[in-house]
């Protein structure tokens, strides 16, 4: 394989942060699947794997190289968190939609805020029967105010989950769990 050389304007270093068990590693695996780097998604939300060290996942998409840094969620690995944050230009904070607002989420938001790292929040596991998107959104807004502004909202809840609605561009994506694919509606 020939290694491609990228201009620095076409490289993005993005940290994946969140509370332990929120689905950070599964999110990266899903991104690899979407980019065609994996033939299937093997992660299971019931898996109890713990990320204990930084891992780098390079994904090329539409001419840009995205270096996703999977950062541990346990406070025991704070040195790894510090190292990961020093290397990123932006962050995706993964929030578990089946729980209340967690310490790991709050820590990720505070750490990225203190370093002026641009970030967005991804509410994960919203297709789970225990998920409550509105509750977690309300908790985030209560704690962080108007800085929490959804671009996408869940379409349905629990077993009635159908997909997400893009409230900026006004379209919906419906998820077919049986085929593991989305379609714009």
List PLM regions with ranges.
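P-loop NTPase switch module centered on the Walker A-proximal segment
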Residues: 2-101, 144, 150
């Amino acid at each position: 394989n020939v290694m491609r050389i990228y201009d620095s304007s076409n490289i993005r270093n993005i940290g994946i942060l969140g509370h332990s068990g929120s689905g950070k590693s599964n999110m990266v695996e899903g991104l690899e699947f979407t980019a065609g780097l994996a033939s299937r998604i093997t992660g299971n939300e019931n898996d109890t794997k713990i990320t204990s060290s930084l891992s780098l996942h390079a994904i090329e998409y539409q001419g840009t190289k995205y270096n996703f840094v999977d950062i541990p969620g346990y406070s025991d690995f704070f040195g790894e968190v510090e190292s990961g944050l020093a290397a990123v230009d932006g962050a995706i904070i993964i929030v578990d939609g089946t729980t209340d607002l967690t310490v790991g989420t709050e820590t990720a938001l505070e750490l990225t805020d203190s370093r002026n790292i641009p970030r967005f929040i991804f509410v994960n596991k919203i297709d789970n029967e225990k998920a409550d998107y509105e509750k977690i959104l309300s908790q985030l807004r209560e704690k962080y105010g108007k800085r929490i502004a959804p671009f996408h909202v869940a379409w349905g809840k629990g077993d009635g989950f159908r997909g997400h609605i893009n409230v900026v561009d006004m379209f919906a994506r419906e998820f077919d769990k049986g085929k593991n694919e989305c379609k714009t509606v």
